[in-house]
Design a protein with these regions (language model features):
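C-terminal, surface-exposed recognition/capping segments
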Residues: 387, 394-518
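Sec-type signal peptide cleavage vicinity
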Residues: 2-384, 394-399
Length: 518
C-alpha cells in the first residue's frame, strides 16, 4: 500500500512521496506478534481449519504516522470451500490493534490455496457495502474503516502443518484529509466532510477473486461525519500550533470505491461561540484513485482573514494603537482609551477639501471611485461566505465588481480612469456636490456567479466613542476625499444587506476600515 499526495494549483497533480507508505510488508516488519487464538478443544480439527493472517500483510486499521496496520475487534474473514459454500470464520478478532490472528474456518479445505475475502463488518461472503454515511469519532483514527466499506482479499496458501497463511490486500480507496488554516481559530470545529463525484463512489459491490470491486454503486456522495464524545462531541477542533500563528485539525479518513472521478470536497465548519457555520468547497479535476492506496487531499481552508485595525479618517496610527487590550471585540461594550483630539497619532487628519488624505487613507479609493462601485458595481450581499477576525468565524459582506471590470463594461480606458470622474461625468474630488447621499438599493442577495470579476468587503462594523457598532451587518470604509461642506466629515462607502451608500454624513473621528481599489 502507498500514500499518494494530491496537490492542486488550478489543476490537480500528484507525486510519490519519498517518505510515503511503502509495501506493507516493510511497514509491518516491526509488529509485535500477539498470542494465537486457539480453536475450542471440543471441536475436531477436521472441521476447523486455521487461516492465519500473519504480520507480513495488511490489516484493517492504520496508524498513519508509524505506517502500521492492524486487525480490529469484530473482524471476520470469509472463504469459499471445496463444496463452493461460503463460510464465515467461527471466531472474530477480539481487541484492538491486533497485528497477527488465527481465524478458524468451518468447511472442507483440501486444495493448496483459497481466496480469503474480507468484506468489511457490514458485508458477507464476497459482498461489500461502501457506506455513503461514514462516521469517525476522533482525529487520526481509522477504527471506522470496517463499517465504512474497507475490504480486501488474500491468497491463502497451505503450509506443511496443514494451516493456511494469507496476506490481505485492500480493495478500496482511502482519502485522507487534514484541515489547516493559516491563522489561529478558537471554538471552531470541523463537523463533517462531504465528497461528491461525477459517478457513484459508494453502494453495493462484489469482491472478485482478483481482488477487484465490481458493481455500479448507488451514491455519488459520501459524507464523513466527525463526531465523538468528550472533546469531540461538537466535531474535531481546529487546534492552534505552538506559535499561535496557525491551526489544524487531526487527520480524517474516508473509504471510497476506486475509479477515475472529478471530486467536489466540502468542509463543514462551525464556531460554537459565534454560532456561525459555513461550508468551504474545493473542486478537483478528473483523477484516477487506485485500490489499496491512500490519497492526501489538499485541505487548506480558504477562509479570508481580516486584521482588527480601524482608523479615524487619515490618522497616522490605528484607532486602538497602543491600547489593543482595551479594544472591544463584542458590540455594546465600551472601550476605554479610544482616540481623542489630544492624541496626535490616532486623531483624524483635519485637512480641508479639496485636499486629499496624506496618511493612512491616502491609498483608499476617492469619492469618484466609490460612486462607480455604488452605481455600477452590481453589489451582491453575501451572508454565507466565511471570514475571520479575533480567532472567530463570521459571515456577512458585500461583493462589488472590480474597477477593471467596471471600466471595461462602461467604456472607460482602464481602472485608473474611474478616479477622475463619477458615472455622471462629474469630478467630486475637485468640485463639491451638495446632494443627498447617492445610493443603490438594487442589491442581489447571493454570491456572484463569477466571483473572479468581483471583490468582497466584510460587514465588519465600526467604532464610535470606543464602542464596536453594526458588526456583521454593516460595513463602513473610508475614502481619500474630505467632504466639502463640513470639516469634520469625509466621504465613505457604507453598505448593509439592502443598500449601498456614498455616505457624506460620517464624522471623521469614527473608527472605520481602510481599503484599496480592486
Amino acid at each position: 500500500m502507498t500514500t499518494k499526495y494530491i496537490t492542486m494549483n488550478i489543476k490537480l497533480s500528484y507525486h510519490w512521496a519519498a517518505a510515503a507508505l511503502l509495501a506493507i510488508a516493510t511497514g509491518c516488519s516491526n509488529d509485535n506478534i500477539t498470542p494465537e487464538t486457539k480453536p475450542d478443544s471440543g471441536k475436531p480439527e477436521t472441521t476447523q481449519v486455521s487461516f492465519i493472517a500473519g504480520n507480513e500483510g495488511t490489516r484493517t486499521s492504520l496508524n498513519y504516522d508509524k505506517e502500521d496496520f492492524y486487525w480490529e475487534d469484530g473482524d471476520r474473514i470469509f472463504v469459499e470451500d471445496d463444496d463452493h459454500t461460503f463460510h464465515a470464520s467461527s471466531n472474530a478478532v477480539s481487541g484492538s490493534k491486533v497485528s497477527h490472528f488465527k481465524f478458524m474456518m468451518p468447511g472442507k479445505y483440501t486444495a493448496n490455496d483459497y481466496i480469503v475475502y474480507y468484506p468489511g463488518k457490514n458485508g458477507t461472503n464476497n459482498q461489500v457495502t461502501i457506506s455513503a454515511n461514514q462516521t469517525q469519532t476522533e482525529p487520526d483514527n481509522t477504527l471506522h474503516f470496517g463499517t465504512s466499506g474497507d475490504c480486501g482479499t488474500g491468497k491463502a496458501t497451505r503450509q506443511t502443518n496443514g494451516q493456511y497463511t494469507f496476506k490481505l490486500n485492500h480493495s478500496a480507496t482511502y482519502l485522507c484529509f487534514k484541515p489547516t488554516f493559516d491563522h489561529p481559530l478558537a471554538s471552531t470545529y470541523v463537523t463533517k466532510i462531504e465528497v461528491t463525484a461525477d459517478q457513484p463512489i459508494a453502494g453495493s459491490y462484489t469482491l472478485g477473486t482478483d481482488g477487484k470491486l465490481t458493481g455500479t454503486g448507488s451514491s455519488t456522495t459520501i459524507t464523513l461525519n466527525l463526531k465523538g464524545t468528550g472533546s469531540y462531541a461538537k466535531g474535531f477542533p481546529m487546534q492552534n500550533d505552538a506559535t499561535a500563528k496557525k491551526c489544524a485539525a487531526g487527520r480524517m479518513f474516508m473509504v471510497m470505491m476506486p475509479g477515475k472521478y472529478k471530486l467536489t470536497v466540502k468542509y463543514y465548519v462551525t464556531d460554537t461561540e459565534t454560532q456561525v457555520s459555513g461550508v468551504i468547497t474545493k473542486k478537483f479535476p478528473a483523477f484516477e484513485y487506485g485500490a489499496n492506496d491512500y490519497y492526501d487531499i489538499p485541505s487548506a481552508l480558504n477562509i479570508k482573514y481580516y486584521g482588527d485595525d480601524y482608523y479615524t479618517w487619515d490618522a497616522k496610527k490605528d484607532y486602538w494603537y497602543g491600547h489593543k487590550n482595551d479594544q472591544p471585540k463584542e458590540m455594546g461594550i465600551p472601550g476605554s482609551n479610544y482616540p481623542t483630539s489630544a492624541d496626535a497619532d490616532r486623531w483624524f487628519n483635519p485637512a480641508k477639501f479639496p485636499a486629499k488624505a496624506s496618511h493612512t487613507a491616502k491609498d483608499c479609493p476617492n469619492v469618484n471611485e466609490i460612486m462607480w462601485y455604488c452605481k455600477k458595481g452590481d453589489p451582491h450581499w453575501d451572508d454565507t461566505t466565511l471570514w475571520t477576525v479575533w480567532q472567530h468565524l463570521y459571515t456577512g459582506g458585500m461583493w462589488f465588481k472590480k474597477a477593471s471590470v467596471i471600466a471595461k463594461e462602461n467604456g472607460e480606458a482602464n481602472a485608473a480612469a474611474l478616479k477622475s470622474k463619477s458615472p455622471d461625468g462629474k469630478d467630486r474630488t475637485s468640485k463639491g456636490e451638495f446632494e443627498t447621499p447617492p445610493n443603490n438599493t438594487s442589491i442581489t442577495q447571493k454570491v456572484p456567479d463569477d466571483r473572479s470579476k468581483y471583490f468582497f468587503l466584510p460587514a465588519i462594523g465600526y467604532y464610535a466613542a470606543g464602542k464596536l457598532t453594526d458588526f456583521g451587518g454593516h460595513g463602513r470604509y473610508w475614502t481619500s476625499t474630505p467632504y466639502p461642506y463640513d470639516k469634520n466629515i469625509s466621504y465613505n462607502l457604507y453598505f448593509h444587506a439592502h443598500d449601498v451608500v456614498v455616505s457624506n454624513g460620517s464624522d471623521r473621528w469614527n473608527g472605520y476600515r481602510l481599503w484599496t481599489s480592486e
